[in-house]
Each structure stands twice: as structure tokens, then as C-alpha cells.
Amino acid sequence: MPSLDSLNCRRSLEVNGKTYHYYSLPEAAKQLGDISRLPTSLKVLLENLLRWEDNVTVRADDFSSLAVWLKTHTSEREIQYRPARVLMQDFTGVPAVVDLTAMRDAVSRAGADPQRINPLSPVDLVIDHSVMVDRFGSDQAFEQNVEIEMQRNGERYEFLRWGQQAFDNFRVVPPGTGICHQVNLEYLGQVVWTKEENGETIAYPDTLVGTDSHTTMINGLGVLGWGVGGIEAEAAMLGQPVSMLIPEVIGMRLTGKLNEGVTATDLVLTVTQMLRKHGVVGKFVEFFGPGLDHLPLADRATIGNMAPEYGATCGFFPVDQVTIDYLRLTGRDPDRIALVEAYSKAQGMWRDSQSPDPVFTATLELDLSQVQPSLAGPKRPQDRVSLGDIGASFDLLLDTSGKTQQADTAVPVAGETFKLKHGAVVIAAITSCTNTSNPNVLMAAGLVAKKALERGLKRAPWVKSSLAPGSKVVTDYLERAGLTTYLDQLGFNLVGYGCTTCIGNSGPLPDAISQAITDNDLIVSSVLSGNRNFEGRVHPLVKANWLASPPLVVAFALAGTTRINMDKEPLGYDEQNQPVYLKDIWPSSAEVNEAVSRIDGQMFRTRYADVFSGDQHWQSIAVTAGDTYKWNNNSSYVQNPPFFEDIGQPPAPPKDVENARILALFGDSITTDHISPAGNIKASSPAGLYLQQLGVQPEDFNSYGSRRGNHEVMMRGTFANIRIKNEMLGGEEGGYTLHQPSGERMSIYDAAMRYQAEGVPLVVVAGKEYGTGSSRDWAAKGTNLLGVKAVIAESFERIHRSNLIGMGVLALQFVGDQNRQSLGLTGNEKLSIRGLSADIKPRQLLTVDVERADGTRENFQVLCRIDTLNEVQYFKAGGILHYVLRQLIEG
């Protein structure tokens, strides 16, 4: 629907002989006042509001609020934002399509047309989360892993093939193609989007939300995008605006340029550490300053990618000549490139050396020349460690873990016996869109491999090594540069095009290695070029996980240990028994640039010409056409969820929660991995026992992430991470709790089901940063299905808070300095939440009454983190999807 355009700012633009219509920010400024120094990211929001003005969801005073932001640098204004498109990966995409399919069933039951459930915005789903590193270290590894992937995921892929034909505006990028964020960066992202409206072509900024927290990678291209839960993304697909507060924007001024030998990975780990320390949760970060002139777009994308790790909603880079050069490099359409430049300049969104610095809420500064070679670990991405300090950092981990320094064990590998010690690198993975989208660090890794082999070095035999790039272009350019053979010889053979180790799909370790780790309680390491290293994520047996650049991943595979100072100690010895140091095999910038210069646009155009076609495996999947899906009750992967069974009944008004029990008591930094793990399913876990009852053998369990289309598996997997610690059981790891008042120890799932049978509502209590990590909607869905009415925490990560509200679960925040410890909560109390009613307001204070086991009573206040009026509506309806579905049924 055309905008009301109350500011009369619609104008036209001629580019290469074609006329485009757009909503002009300079014209709007004639009534709003000078907005030239508004952060570019907020200019994108302002254009969105101008284009969607309807006097219902978007009003003229919304524009004024953004203009006033220039004076106040902050705002309490809620706006309704409509992104141009939605991006999904298959772990989050399958449950979203399951929900849409179940909504069609609900609409059909209500006597309406199921075609009412269709994406209104373009949706791209990239299958990248399912491939595992089952085979490695051989030329056959890729084909073998593809075969195994297709066998494991046949039910899921058949369902997605059905969805591809059943839903409009819905495209699927088949498995074995790449990682969604890299495909988005190299192909899907347009920077400026166009659509036909009443016979005219409208141009506007390319914007998106994605069902993966690292959607922010596209910010490096000047495209505003961030991760949301699958729940919120589904609502956006169906025409619901994204409700948000106008954010604070933190400016990060970059000066200087990176020194010789310093990589984009070193830079992003430094940025992550700085911004986490400053505190940017729920805020935009925008990069500016003369340092951008020396920062390639691939480096910008790496920084944008890790916005979830530094806590920001996004990490945005404005469009400039570097953007245009990248669009040309990746083979984009010349007319689109011309439009991007002309539109950005016409809108005052173009950056160059003459651009005035924007006004920000606060500003940080980083001199790029001060960045040092770094890793991050062993448990958090923000814990940066200088390369020379990693050995000391690991020894500190040993000391705090109470381990003996010299523990080791003999391990037979490939016919030889080796000593496996604390700190041994058992996984070295060149993985993840974060770094494999960056030709500079990929070429550097290949050059390190080449130089290492020339000096006679080999990969340590206990290291499981792998190469899993985010697009097929990567293997093309490594091959063209003549570097593939060297990576292969060191065991970094191609294992797949997908997320693999970065998301926990590292596959099994060799039996002898696993046995040695388990029998001797060894703390061993993984080194990966990924973006997350939370406990239990990479591999359940690997407790120390280090994020590093691809060339450093190769170096640690050579050294075989993280108990090393690579600045001073050799990686190994050559055939003359001379020490070989990292500096001896590290490539110069000139060598890297020479290799990168071989990349051209035709490589990208060729690979992306048939990106939606898939291989013979994909094309051979048979599907039955139809508007509604024929559910298979015997499927262990895809089941009709229970979320919409009561949609025919009016929602009950909010009411107080009476005499709830505490299901679990957690500490700080409980991640969505802790709440809803994506990796291995333990045979003895509730989910494992359920699958075995269906006749699924443990070797065929696949992963939690692959089974998100089956609510029975996922609710059993909620709070089932093997590294989660419920304080009700002291320091014990695993998804267990104490049932109250019996005090009986049992799995969290079994306790929740017992409480449901007893008619007892539940709450979860936690510390700071609850729900950090992936945009995992099942972390909220599973919480809901366990019967949890509220989560009370000291603070919430942005996406998970939104997801909880979207599933009808209260997110309640302790006030002031209060927390579970200051209030003496132990887990055996009864909690009642007072103040819930039909007239609940955003960010209202509620009262929690506490009844202790000895009968004593007290109370404390909490801040209800229903943050916006839209969220109030969603909560009253029982959740955002219930709200949208009722609207669609009612027409």
C-alpha cells in the first residue's frame, strides 16, 4: 500500500536510463530539520517509516522522534519497522515452516482459506546447519558427508521441498551450497531493493531480519539486518511489523590500518572485547572514521557477523566506494551497482573522506595499528587472549579446574602411539561464515600450509582437521591460487559447505582419542575460525575452545597443543632438526594480496547461476503437491505442533501466577545453547530415550538442531545441555533438578511433566545475560511447553527476551541490586507473581511473593520486560503467532 507521504517527500531518480521513485530524506529534512548527521543506520529506519506511513502503525510523529534523536541521542519511542525480506537457515527454518503449516491447518479448521497463510515478504531459506564432519582427512570426505547428510535428513528435506512449492515468496537454497550469511553477502544482498507499485519502480534500502543471530554479517555491506527468533520472523513474513524502540547508537571510530601479519579475525576479537566491556546490548553500533578507507569489505563483514558476540543488535557500515568495489568483485548486476551508488548519494547515506561524523549516543575509538594477533577463549568470544599468552591462559584454566599439570596418556593413531596431554588440540577447523567469507584469511591459511609443508612440518596425528567454507567460490579461488593441494596434504580436506564445527556439528572424535579424554579426564582444546566457543558447543568432550583466524587454525594443527607461546616456541622441527617458528611460515601481505588478485566476478556469477537448483540428491526428492501437508505420525523429524490447538477459543486474560515452583536456578551467562542445545543427543537423556522408543538407534539420532520440527524431541531437550548447572544441585552438570517438595532428583523434563500433572505452574530463576547466544526460538518454545510461566533474571539478551514474550512467557528482571543470591533463593520456595491483569502496561513493576519451606513469607519487585505496546497485545493473545493467526482467521 502506498505511503500517505504527509511530508511530500516522494521523488524520482534517473539511473542508466531507468526511472526509480523513492522517499527522499533530504526532502523530508525540509520539514524535520537538518538530519545530515543522523547515524546512517537510523536514516535507514527513517526511510522505512516514511515509506510505510499509514497513520495507524506509522504516524508522522514517528519521523519527528528520529529527528529529535539528534538532540537527545536516545529515545523511548516505539516504532513499527518493516524489513524488506527474511533470511532463514534450516535449523530455525524447519520449525518456522512447521508453524506456518500448522497455521494453515488451523485456518482450514476454522473454515477459511489456508492460502491466507503465505509469506508477504520474500523469504530465503538456506540449508546449511545439517552437514556434520563424520568423515575428514581424505579426498572422499565431502562426498561421504553429503551422502550421510541426505540419509539422515531425508524427512526434513522432503518437508522443505513441499514447502518450496506450497508457499509463495519462499525460496530454498539446497544443501551443499553454502552458509546462509555468506550466500547473503555474496549473492542475495542487493544494498538497494526495488519493487513494482502501481506501474512504478520503487527503490529503497535492502533490509532484513533473519532467524539466525549472525544475520548481522550483512551490515558489512551497508544492509541493515539482524537476527530475530523464528517466532518473530514468522510474524514478519505474515505482514506483522517488527515492534522496536528507537535504539541508542554507539559510534566506533576507526583510525589507522592493520599492521603486517594482523588479520580481520584479530581485529574482530579486539572489537568484541571492547564493545562487550562498554555494554551495547540492545543498541546499534555504527563504524565510522578514516580507518574505513583501509578496511576491505570482507573484514567489515567479519566485524558485522560477530555483533551478537559483542551484544549489539547490529554492527553497521555505511555504503562507500569499498562497497561498490565488492559488488563488482562478486559479479552483481551493473545496473544494480549504479543504482546503489546513485541512491546512496541522493539519500545522504554515502560515506567518503569528506563526510561529516554522525552524532552518536556514545563514541569509542580504535587505532587499527594497535591490534595484535589474538585468539578468544576458552569459553567466551569476548575473552580475547594475545597469541603469545595462550599457553599461560590454558595453564590458568588447568589450575582453576584443579587438574594436575602433567596428566597424559598413550593413544594409538594410524598405527603409531602418541602421548595425549592436557591442552592437546583435538579439533582444528577452518569453518564458519565469520571467516570463510574473507579471501584474505583463507588465502593466508593456504599459504601457511604451503610454507609448512615446504619446511617438512605435518599436522599432529591426534588433530581432527577440516575445511568447511561458506560458499563454493572459496574452493574455486583456493584451487585457482594453487593452494588446495597444500591444505589437503595437511588434512584440511573439504568436508562440506555448511556451518559444521562452528555450530557443534564437529562429528565424532576417533574412538581412541575419545577414550583417552574420558578415562583421564583430560582438558583438551579445539581451535576454530568460528564465532562461538561456549561450553559444550563445539564437542561435548572438548572443554577449552579457542576462536582464531584460519591461518592460526593451521598453525595450531601443526603444533598440536594450545600450551605453547607461538611468539617464542617452535611449531615443530624440519628434516634437519631445525626449529620452525610461526614467523617462518607466516605469509606477507604481498603474498596474500597476489593470491587474492586471482579472484574475479565470473567465479561468483558461475557459482550462483543455479543456486536454487541443488544436486541430484536434492532434485530426486519426491514431494506431494498441495496447500496443506499430510503429516506422518511416524516421523521422528516433523510433527504437527500443539501451539494452535486452542485457537478457536478466545484467549484468557492475563492473571496472577499462584504458588509456582522453581524448575531451575541458574547463574550468569546461560546461553540459548544451554537452554536448547543444537548438538548431540545423549542416549540416556529424555530425548534419547524417546527416540529409542520410536525405534531410532543412537547412531541415527542426528542432532537436536535437526529435530526442531518435532516438538516431542525439543521439549525433552530443553535445559538438557550436558554443561548446564542448576544451582539447586550444587556444581553438578547436566539437565537435572530437584522436584519440590519431595526433593527427588530427576531430569528437568521429567520434573516439569510431574509438575504439570500436579497442576503446579513453574518459573526459572537466573543471573545476568540470560539467553545470550543464538536466536534460538526453541529456547522459548521449549520453555513454554514445559509449563514455565516466567523467567526471572538479572538481565536478558535481546532476542531471547523477545522470543519469551512471543511465546507468552513472562521475562521478569530483578530491580536494582537484588538477585537470587541477595534474596536467598534456594529453589525450594513457592513464588506468586502479582499485578498481572488485562490492563498490563509495558515495563510495569510487578510483585513476587515468596513462601519459603519453613512457611516464612516476603516479597520483592521485578520489572516486567514486556517492552512495547505491541508486545502487550501479543502477550494477551497468548503469543505473537496466536495474535497474527486470529487476525488472519478473522480476515
What kind of region is each of these model predictions?
Residues D574-S589, R801-Y874:
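Acidic, glycine-rich flexible loop/linker segments
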Residues D54-K257, A264-L269, P373-A376, I390, ...:
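Long, structured ligand/cofactor-binding scaffold of large enzymes
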Residues M1-R82, W618-Q619, G626, K630, ...:
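Acidic/polar, glycine-rich intrinsically disordered N-terminal extensions of enzymes
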Residues F288-L295, N531, A752-M753, A757-E797:
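Extracellular/luminal Protease-associated
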